[in-house]
């Protein structure tokens, strides 16, 4: 697990933002090429790629970028997000998280598991499926959105928090290369307080939910302990099944996301402590801003969270 200091990221942001952004992006890019090489080497025997990881790990963008790298190697990749198999709100009883007093939106019961299992079985058999699309703003599932079928020299990349769960995926695992994505780095404050990986992911999720899912930061904070519970229940038990791993953290992102959080939580810093995110509160006003827009590439994983 990599460790960065607050002093380091502030110094890089203040002294040479362009080089800081480029170095972070290049490190992530190198990881993707190593993973793509392994996928390509196994694609005839394993035409399925499963991408798993906790909330706000950058699964969607990493999926897309791996697909483009593989295309250059002559391997066409179909993309499927398990998020598109969520059921329409109001058509089922959402499981309740008694521990945190909120709906358990991470539960696999929120997904159309019968449809997903049917699609996975038919895909491996070479049949065509019609993938749905889930609208997070209206929480509505749109069926038969696009066709997917595996042909020669093609693979399917399936990303989602339940992608390693054998109860859901069945025998698909033997046809698959499994890739685990997450923020796997720690930020150390001036007093050696640890900002843990899940806290860095919270920053991503808070901004993404606000910008793209019509959910204010306060709501994301209230849900966060339940999200973490879901990760312990639905992701951590299967993490060891991964064939490959990617650390999607870009150190310069903290300089961007902390500025956003500071603006949104003026006078409400105690909410961070209530969500077990106290170290973020300690650095709210201690992270230097960064002039990143001229240097951040169009395919950066951060676009998934900040637009």
Q: Where are these predicted regions, by residue range?
A:
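Hydrophobic positions on the alpha1 helix immediately C-terminal to the Walker A/P-loop
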Residues: 61-66, 81
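Conserved NTP phosphate-binding and transfer environment spanning the P-loop NTPase/kinase superfamily
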Residues: 17-22, 29, 166-307
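Conserved glycine(s) of the Walker
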Residues: 58
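Charged, amphipathic alpha-helical linker segments immediately N-terminal to NTP-binding catalytic cores
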Residues: 1-37
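Hydrophobic anchor at the beta1->P-loop junction of P-loop NTPases
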Residues: 49-51
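Post-Walker A helix-loop "phosphate-sensing" segment adjacent to the P-loop in P-loop NTPases
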Residues: 68-78
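Glycine-rich phosphate-binding loop used to anchor ATP phosphates in small-molecule kinases
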Residues: 45, 115-174, 221-238, 253
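Conserved nucleotide-sensing/catalytic segment adjacent to the nucleotide-binding pocket
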Residues: 78-80, 87-138, 155
């Amino acid at each position: 697990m990599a460790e960065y200091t607050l002093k380091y990221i502030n110094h890089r942001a203040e002294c040479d933002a362009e080089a800081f952004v480029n170095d972070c992006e290049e490190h992530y890019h190198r990881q993707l090429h190593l993973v793509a090489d392994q996928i390509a080497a196994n694609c005839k025997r394993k035409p399925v790629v499963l991408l798993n990881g906790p909330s706000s790990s950058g699964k969607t963008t990493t999926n897309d970028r791996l697909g483009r790298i593989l295309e250059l190697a002559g391997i066409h990749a179909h993309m499927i997000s398990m998020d598109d198999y969520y059921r329409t709100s109001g058509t089922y009883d959402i499981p309740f998280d008694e521990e945190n007093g909120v709906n358990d939106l991470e539960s696999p019961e929120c997904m159309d598991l019968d449809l997903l299992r049917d699609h996975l079985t038919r895909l491996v058999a070479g049949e065509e499926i019609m993938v749905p699309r889930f609208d997070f703003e209206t929480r509505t599932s749109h069926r038969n959105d696009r066709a997917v079928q595996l042909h020669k020299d093609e693979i399917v990349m399936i990303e989602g928090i339940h992608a390693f769960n054998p109860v859901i995926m069945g025998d698909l695992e033997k046809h698959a290369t499994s890739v685990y994505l997450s923020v796997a780095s720690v930020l150390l404050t001036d007093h050696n307080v640890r900002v843990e990986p899940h806290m860095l992911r919270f920053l991503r999720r808070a901004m993404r939910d606000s910008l793209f899912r019509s959910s204010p930061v306060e709501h994301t904070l209230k849900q966060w302990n339940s999200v973490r519970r879901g990760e312990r229940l639905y992701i951590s038990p299967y993490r060891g099944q991964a064939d490959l791993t990617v650390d999607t953290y870009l150190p310069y992102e903290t300089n961007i996301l902390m500025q956003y959080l500071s603006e949104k939580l003026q006078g409400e810093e105690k909410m961070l402590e209530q969500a077990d995110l106290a170290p973020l509160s300690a650095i709210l006003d201690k992270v230097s801003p960064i002039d990143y827009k001229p240097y951040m590439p169009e395919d950066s994983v951060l676009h998934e969270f900040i637009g």
